[in-house]
Design a protein with these regions (language model features):
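A surface-exposed partner-binding patch
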Residues: 1-109, 138-142
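Compact, glycine/acidic-enriched structural inserts
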Residues: 106-137
Length: 144
């Protein structure tokens, strides 16, 4: 299957870090497979390509919110958890019954209540919007 999302995720390095994408910005496919085997989870195509493109890029993997390393992925409450905020108030996930969808919808859980709410977008939409918010809106505010 052709890469559907890889180039779009790779393009985030020059857009937000003002540097060319390098292979070390992503995780090698064999390492990703090994870490997913350790976690014991399957992931959607979009998340696989996200890790292949950016899994080694700490500046993006930990840009305000923290993406879980592949070996830390877990299914909880019927969702594959992949992201948390710095205060650990929220966690983001993909419904476990949607992992075969190439680009599934993203949901957010308020940890204090344990309630899930749709983010009204797919993983690729959510991630691209999140990085735009972090680097184009939030970061300039924090610098002032």
């Amino acid at each position: 299957m052709a890469d559907m999302f890889l180039e779009k995720f790779q393009s985030l390095v020059p857009r937000y870090l003002e540097d060319e994408w390098q292979p070390e910005d992503g995780l090698p496919a064999d390492i990703l497979t090994e870490e997913l085997d350790t976690a014991g989870v399957d992931i959607p195509l979009v998340l696989r390509e996200f890790y292949l493109a950016l899994g080694g890029c700490e500046d993006l993997m930990e840009a305000y919110y923290y993406f879980f390393d592949p070996d830390e992925l877990a299914i909880e409450d019927g969702y594959l958890l992949f992201l948390e905020d710095e205060e650990e108030e929220y966690v983001w996930g993909i419904r476990a019954d949607q992992l075969d969808v190439p680009d599934p919808m993203v949901f957010r859980r308020l940890n204090a209540r344990g309630t899930w709410k749709s983010e009204e977008g797919t993983f690729s939409e959510y991630v691209l919007d999140m990085f735009a918010w972090v680097f184009e809106e939030l970061e300039p505010e924090l610098e002032n």
